[in-house]
């Protein structure tokens, strides 16, 4: 009988499939299109489980687990070095496992430098874009400045996220250079005091503080909001539906960001993470993402597969002088981010 049980057990193990591989991906909504997930799973046999998040939530989740629970995350490049230095949330990138030929060289190098901690780099680029304004030009003509977000003539039709872009954009509009103050805590605090007062005074002008892109798009689509802080890709989606709505890069400069791939410190399936990176950065796959999400990719040769509609949006919004005026986020020091968080909390709580 024992021999029979042993044989049955051996047969069961022999007939069972190998343990299925899983990639736990912590990312922004839209960054893992279903078509690409399905294609990756078919090609590799690796199941992709996606958790949607944003910069603040990614940091909070990874801090809570000390870098465990996920195999790959996608923070913005300016939000990596300070949290890595303080909390050790990520592991260094093994560039030997990255197909560097897939990336725009200057962007790959910039992210290497901007995520450098103790002579090791912690991310590679995925995509980039800007924060600026989405404007319904039929209802709010001539908007060109970040100051539109505190302009009484748009009372009840203004929206923005209570996050750092509105602080940074308004700072530039009020003739500060916030990035130059990163090393001057006292000067940065004085600037934040001015911004806090302006945004509290302007609270009665605000229709809502949006918290996700779909909420913003719907409020602009329905006409509830006519001027809002927004990402360029969301504005382009609305423009495709209604040409009166479009993206406006403020005259003080749109705010440029790069979202990345970073591998958490306690990732269980590191090899799957590198496979996903090299897969989604292949030109045709990267272009599929760009065409769907209207977000520029860091994939070097994706341009030949990007559709004409996206190219038209990009060319209309970003003539060369606008590109030259983009204010790119440098790595934000932890003390600066903490100061901003307290200011944003006070603005939210103010009556």
Language-model segments: what does each one mean?
Residues 192-202, 241-265:
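Periplasmic-binding protein-like
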Residues 16-20:
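Sec/Tat signal peptide C-region and signal peptidase I cleavage site
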Residues 79-82, 227-244:
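A ligand-binding cleft/hinge motif common to bilobed small-molecule-binding domains
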């Amino acid at each position: 009988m024992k021999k029979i049980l042993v044989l049955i057990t051996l047969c069961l193990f022999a007939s069972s499939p190998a343990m299925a591989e899983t990639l736990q991906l912590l990312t922004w909504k839209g960054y893992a299109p279903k078509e690409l997930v399905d294609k990756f799973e078919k090609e590799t046999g690796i199941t992709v489980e996606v958790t949607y998040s944003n910069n603040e939530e990614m940091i909070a989740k990874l801090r809570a687990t000390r870098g465990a629970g996920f195999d790959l995350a996608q923070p913005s490049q300016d939000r990596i070095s300070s949290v890595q230095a303080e909390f050790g949330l990520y592991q260094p990138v093994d560039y030997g496992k990255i197909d560097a030929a897939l990336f725009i060289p200057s962007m790959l190098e910039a992210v290497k430098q901007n995520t450098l901690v103790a002579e090791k780099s912690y991310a590679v680029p995925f995509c980039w874009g800007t924060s600026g304004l989405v404007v319904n030009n039929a209802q709010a003509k001539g908007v060109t400045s970040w100051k539109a977000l505190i302009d009484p003539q748009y009372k009840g039709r203004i929206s923005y996220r209570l996050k750092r872009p509105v602080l940074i954009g308004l700072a530039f509009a009020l003739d500060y250079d916030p990035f130059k103050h990163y090393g001057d805590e006292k000067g940065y605090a004085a600037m934040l005091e001015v911004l806090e007062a302006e945004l509290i005074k302007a609270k009665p002008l605000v229709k809502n503080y949006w918290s996700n892109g779909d909420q913003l798009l719907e409020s602009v689509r329905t006409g509830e909001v006519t001027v809002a802080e927004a990402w360029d890709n969301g504005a382009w989606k609305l423009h495709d539906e209604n040409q009166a709505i479009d993206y406006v890069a403020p005259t003080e400069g749109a705010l440029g960001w790069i979202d990345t791939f970073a591998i958490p410190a306690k990732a269980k399936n590191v090899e799957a993470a590198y496979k996903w990176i090299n897969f989604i950065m292949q030109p045709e796959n990267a272009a599929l993402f760009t065409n769907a999400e209207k977000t520029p990719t860091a994939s070097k040769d994706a341009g030949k597969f990007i559709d004409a509609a996206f190219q038209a949006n990009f060319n209309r919004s970003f003539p060369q002088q606008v590109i030259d005026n983009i204010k790119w986020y440098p790595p934000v020091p932890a003390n600066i981010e903490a100061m901003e968080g307290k200011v944003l909390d006070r603005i939210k709580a103010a009556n």
